[in-house]
Amino acid sequence: MNKDEYIKILEKRVEEYEAAIADMTAPIIPSIIPQTILVPVTGLLMAERLEKITAKILNHIKEHDIEFAIIDFTDITVDRIEQMCLTELGEQIRNLTDSINLMGVKPYFVGMTPQLIKEIVLSGIELNAETHANFQAALKHLMKINSLVFRKI
């Protein structure tokens, strides 16, 4: 095998690893609440990653009967936002929100740190999504609006 062939093989392997990492850093998890998904976003945030996460969520919504999408930013702090100004981050999050809304699904954002919230507010971006402090609070809210209760058996 010559040098060019070897480079192509390595480039393909890198693409495969990047795809695997992207899947692991924003898995789509079905919730105990019917028609609800949880998407924990972890790792460094870049515009390209947010676009891929948005596409992944929209494809999942298209293929499944989803009413609520809980996007969990617990792992994301201002220092985990790479090469992207906070205005751009706000725009990407707004695009995610608008896209989910256009699919007929209600987005919920949870786990935003006070620092991240402050930066989004200062950027002037208006988010059209309900927010909760954490995943548990969002689940309690969804259980209430869906008249669901947990019972011991």
Model-derived features with residue positions:
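Alpha-helix N-cap and loop-to-helix initiation/capping positions
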Residues: 48-52, 84-91, 130
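Amphipathic alpha-helical interaction surfaces in cytosolic regulatory modules
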Residues: 75-122
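STAS-typified acidic loop motif
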Residues: 27-55
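Non-catalytic signal-transmission and effector/linker regions of two-component phosphorelay proteins
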Residues: 146-153
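Long, leucine- and charge-enriched amphipathic alpha-helices
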Residues: 1-27
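Short acidic-hydrophobic, aromatic-tinged amphipathic segments that line or gate anion-handling sites
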Residues: 128-138
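A short, well-ordered alpha-helical element
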Residues: 47-69
